[in-house]
């Protein structure tokens, strides 16, 4: 089970961050499909051209994460 602050590697192949390492920001206990919010140091491609905007968090299921030490 992952917990807040864990470093995790992303295993969801269709994710922009596949293979990258992020930090668990929170884990929702409400029984939703993707309860783990992971924060990354980089942003994705959603920013406008030439701007630093974009998203640096995403939700994942625990089965899509590998805890690293």
From Swiss-Prot:
- InterPro entries (alphabetical): Elect_transpt_acc-like_dom_sf (IPR008990), PSI_PsaE (IPR003375)
Domain of life where this protein originates: Bacteria
* One family name in Pfam for this protein: PSI_PsaE
Where in the cell does this protein reside? Answer: Cellular thylakoid membrane
**Cited SUPFAM superfamilies:** Electron transport accessory proteins (SSF50090)
Keywords for this protein: Membrane, Photosynthesis, Photosystem I, Thylakoid
Q: Does the keyword Thylakoid apply?
A: yes
Main localization, broad class: membrane
Q: Which GO terms describe its cellular component?
A: photosystem I reaction center; plasma membrane-derived thylakoid membrane
* GO annotation terms (biological process): photosynthesis
Look up and give the membrane topology term.
Peripheral membrane protein
Q: Which family does it belong to?
A: Belongs to the PsaE family.
Q: What does the UniProt record say this protein does?
A: Stabilizes the interaction between PsaC and the PSI core, assists the docking of the ferredoxin to PSI and interacts with ferredoxin-NADP oxidoreductase.
Q: What is this protein's record name? A: Photosystem I reaction center subunit IV
Q: Which organism is it from?
A: Rippkaea orientalis (strain PCC 8801 / RF-1)
Gene name, per UniProt, is psaE
